[in-house]
């Protein structure tokens, strides 16, 4: 089977796409991969070098939520239709909801990694203000959901959110994200420290919660590259854990190997997000045997269940208390680290994710063939 996949290099979708593409090719599939957003750096595409059955087509079409997204959506749609005509895939795997209604004679599966309306609700606690752009966006996504052969979400919460915002799809499926466990080291001796990933200025990730109270153990936040917008708290920007008033150190973007080392050393991972449909970084932390301390939101409760410690929703005091309790009880910390590790290996591994997608591909393709 030949699958055309769309992706972008702006966030964790690229990591998810890499795991899926590698898994599909290992099972005999051919993959044409199209990326949007930004042209990736060479280190972001190095993984493709060993894949003979992968054709990669990078583009700079902007995503639907970016400035100029409306025009680029039209141009991107025309480009994809032409590419489908040229490459003749058996199925489209579209990692952007807006393209679900492409006028092409092949099945279309779209994956809801996130969207602007559900993001806004989660971050601001209210509906977004009406505008000409929002009207276009709602109409585009609703049409895409209605026309797609299947809509996939990485959690039941996200599937329900998409359904309530844009209507029901012809076929709905929940397929959890997955990572290859062999990439992570769960056996290194842990340091009594907390790791978090996200920009301090990102209201959805809200890692800034970790800076609002004095922490009892060192905390490292990765991804806060803009020093001018940091909260007013004493933090250091070097590569060592800070012993400042907040016990927080801030690092810029890290390579994957650097991140894996940080995961392997940190005893705890703080998932502070108020909007997290999938939680890829938490999967990576769990596969590194970090104990998870998570914001108490429905999506994270659904994904991690009893394999994590939860703090009161969006509450910095409760987060600091959870860190204090877990760091002070080594047996409890190891217990939760092992729970997260086992759950991630069983439920959120790349092999299982790929198998689930292949099953869906075959169902959708056979249904289309029968209908024809």
Language model feature labels by segment:
Residues 188-205, 209-224:
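Conserved donor-binding/catalytic core segment of Leloir-type glycosyltransferases
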Residues 308-317, 325-331:
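Conserved acidic donor-binding segment of nucleotide-sugar-dependent glycosyltransferases
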Residues 146-147, 153, 159-179, 187:
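Helix-loop-beta element that forms the nucleotide-linked donor phosphate-binding surface
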Residues 291-294:
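Short hydrophobic beta-strand element within catalytic cores of glycosyltransferases
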Residues 232-257:
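Nucleotide-activated donor-binding/catalytic signature segment of Leloir-type glycosyltransferases, i.e.
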Residues 274:
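Aromatic "clamp/platform" in nucleotide-sugar-dependent glycosyltransferases that forms part
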Residues 91, 103-127:
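Active-site proximal beta-strand in glycosyltransferases
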